[in-house]
């Protein structure tokens, strides 16, 4: 492959195998199940004591599903995650349980959970007999948590559950010894971006801010840019390929305007542009075929059409023959004197009299005989070879001696030259050579930085929102200077949309511009921005397995409702529903009696 030319991988997800839980998961104590329920991808696995902290979750799949409409393979049931294979042919059928990052369709969420439990090898009968650690959105609505708790306790019969925020679990995993410290978490995912202040290990929910932009919007923006740039390849510029460009070829510019000026230089453009190779066919139909190949192709098409017509005639003949046999059988009933069966058969055939039956038999017999004759004639025609109508060309071997004689005579003619007017030169047809691959390439230049830039400048896609830097400045201004200094010493980046090269350097530049002169700050990128949330939830589950202060049991769910939440270092803040107090019946009765007494006194005074 040439320099800066990258083919699209078009990766197709392989179906997940049904795994075995193993002896560790079936120990004397129930082993927790850890589910990172993300809007882009679901990650599920076991939190086994003594497990190597390195292995990835045993199950990772896209949080989408599609209901089949039948087909050749009869796959009419719902397909989930990696079982879908390539997403592009099914893009119009894909459904997600999430609205932004909040699960709202619990029917689809149940499909994701069924898929997770089945492929993890949960073998308990009638229920999921394991505690569950489940991630939820920042400031998750109470109704969403209530529906999720109802699904887990009523449908799956789990013993207990704990909810937490994915970015806080990632923070917990990267700072296990300083989990009670303060800091600022910048979490950017598939649907939105959050800036979360942490004070002494707990989320300061009233100062959290959300930006409704993430990796999904960046992929959509990149798709629109390239479709406008290459309208001829509109169908080939798919969302899956745009996500591939984002994940593998995009980066964050430390200074966006200065980087755009660099791209104006032709040498810089030539050295840094990424040429994405689209799939294409190197053989052009109709232009590379010889006349003999075209003739052979026409003959094949003619044979195929004749065979198709013959097959249809045979099928029609078979149906007519079966109907004729049925009519002849009914006629035999009449000849044998079985009148009851004969009249019953006439009614089934929707006929009124034996004469009508006889007339129909004659017509059908003629049609069957004609169809047989056509089939025989078609078979004879198939055996006849197609005669080539092209005129025969002279034998080249016979022409070669005469051509040599003419050339030798021209050598002795002093007046003859190839430049003589009236003498035609031999025409040599030069076929131009085209590099077809170059006509199927997407030149991704400034788009490499424009797409991920939207989380810093939402105005690029017309969103009236503040970017990360403005949101960060707004949150810091709400705290005293000493707390500001404490927060900026621990700025933590996590989430799949922070994996762009240059993200950390860009945040350091933004903080340098907004902080006072010679002040210090520290920016840290998660060791694995995608999987650290699951790792942190697993670590938290193992460290708090016997701590009843953080787990919601079934009894507490039944007593306090599905929206109930127990707070911990990685959870949301629980704000219970406050219903207005209703006046008691006794107070209502006293108020009504006082009103009636006052009304009666007034009437007497007026009288």
Curated annotation (Swiss-Prot):
Low complexity: compositionally biased ranges: 584-596
SUPFAM superfamilies, per the entry: Actin-like ATPase domain
Cross-link position per record: Glycyl lysine isopeptide (Lys-Gly) (interchain with G-Cter in SUMO2): 283
Alphabetical keyword list: Coiled coil, Cytoplasm, DNA damage, DNA recombination, DNA repair, Isopeptide bond, Nucleus, Transcription, Transcription regulation, Ubl conjugation
Cellular localisation: Nucleus; Cytoplasm
GO BP terms: chromatin remodeling; DNA recombination; double-strand break repair; positive regulation of DNA repair; positive regulation of DNA-templated transcription; positive regulation of telomere maintenance in response to DNA damage; regulation of cell cycle; regulation of chromosome organization
Subunit field text: Component of the chromatin remodeling INO80 complex; specifically part of a complex module associated with the helicase ATP-binding and the helicase C-terminal domain of INO80. Interacts with DDB1. Interacts with ACTR8; the interaction is observed in asynchronous (interphase) cells but not in metaphase-arrested cells indicative for a possible dissociation of the INO80 complex in mitotic cells.
Function of the protein: Proposed core component of the chromatin remodeling INO80 complex which is involved in transcriptional regulation, DNA replication and probably DNA repair. Involved in DNA double-strand break repair and UV-damage excision repair.
Family to which the UniProt record says this protein belongs: Belongs to the actin family. ARP5 subfamily.
Record's protein name: Actin-related protein 5
Name of the coding gene: ACTR5
């Amino acid at each position: 492959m040439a320099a800066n030319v990258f083919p699209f991988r078009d990766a197709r997800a392989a179906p997940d195998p049904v795994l075995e839980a193993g002896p560790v998961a079936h120990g004397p104590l129930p082993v927790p199940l850890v589910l990172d329920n993300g809007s882009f991808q679901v990650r599920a696995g076991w939190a086994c004591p003594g497990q190597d902290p390195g292995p990835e979750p045993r199950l990772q799949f896209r949080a989408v599903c599609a209901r089949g409409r039948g087909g050749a393979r009869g796959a009419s049931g719902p397909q989930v995650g990696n079982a879908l294979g390539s997403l592009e042919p099914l893009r119009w059928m894909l459904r997600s349980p999430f609205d932004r990052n909040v699960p709202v369709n619990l029917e689809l969420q149940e499909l994701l959970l069924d898929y997770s439990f089945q492929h993890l090898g949960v073998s308990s009968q009638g229920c999921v007999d394991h505690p569950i650690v489940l991630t939820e959105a920042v400031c998750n609505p109470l109704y969403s948590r209530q529906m999720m708790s109802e699904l887990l306790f009523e449908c799956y019969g789990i013993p207990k559950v704990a909810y937490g925020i994915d970015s806080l679990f990632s923070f917990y995993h990267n700072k296990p010894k300083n989990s009670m410290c303060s800091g600022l978490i910048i979490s950017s995912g598939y649907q939105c971006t959050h800036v979360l202040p942490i004070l002494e290990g707990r989320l300061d929910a009233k100062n959290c801010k959300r930006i409704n932009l993430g990796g999904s919007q960046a992929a959509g923006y990149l798709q629109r840019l390239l479709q406008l740039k290459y309208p001829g390849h509109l169908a080939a510029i798919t969302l899956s390929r745009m996500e591939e460009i984002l994940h593998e070829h995009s980066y964050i510019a430390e200074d966006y305007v200065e980087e755009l000026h660099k791209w104006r230089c032709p040498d810089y453009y030539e050295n840094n542009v990424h040429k994405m190779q689209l799939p294409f066919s190197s053989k052009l139909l109709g232009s590379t075929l010889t006349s003999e190949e075209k003739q052979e192709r026409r003959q094949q098409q003619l044979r195929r059409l004749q065979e198709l017509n013959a097959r249809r005639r045979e099928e029609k003949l078979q149906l007519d023959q079966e109907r004729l046999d049925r009519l002849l059988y009914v006629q035999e009933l009449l000849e044998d004197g079985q009148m009851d069966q004969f009249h019953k058969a006439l009614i089934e055939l929707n006929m009124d009299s034996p004469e009508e039956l006889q007339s129909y038999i004659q017509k059908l017999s003629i049609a069957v005989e004609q169809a047989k004759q056509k089939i025989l004639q078609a078979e004879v025609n198939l055996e006849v070879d197609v005669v080539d109508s092209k005129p025969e060309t002279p034998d080249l071997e016979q022409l070669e001696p005469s051509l040599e004689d003419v050339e030798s005579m021209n050598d002795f003619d002093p007046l003859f030259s190839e430049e003589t007017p009236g003498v035609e030169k031999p025409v040599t047809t030069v076929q131009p050579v085209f590099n077809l691959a170059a006509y199927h390439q997407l030149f991704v230049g400034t788009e490499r930085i424009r797409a991920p830039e939207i989380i810093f400048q939402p105005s690029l896609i017309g969103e009236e929102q503040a970017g990360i830097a403005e949101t960060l400045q707004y949150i810091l201004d709400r705290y005293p200077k000493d707390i500001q200094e404490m927060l900026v010493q621990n700025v933590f980046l996590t989430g799949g949309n922070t994996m762009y090269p240059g993200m950390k350097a860009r945040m350091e530049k933004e903080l340098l511009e907004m902080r006072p002169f010679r002040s210090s700050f520290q920016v840290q990128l998660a060791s694995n921005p995608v999987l650290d949330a699951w790792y942190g939830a697993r670590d938290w589950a193992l460290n708090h397995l016997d701590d009843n202060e953080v787990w919601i049991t079934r009894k507490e769910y039944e007593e306090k409702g599905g929206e109930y939440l127990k707070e911990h270092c990685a959870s949301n803040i629980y704000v219970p529903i406050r219903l207005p107090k209703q006046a008691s019946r006794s107070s209502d009765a006293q108020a009504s009696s006082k009103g009636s007494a006052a009304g009666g006194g007034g009437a007497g005074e007026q009288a």
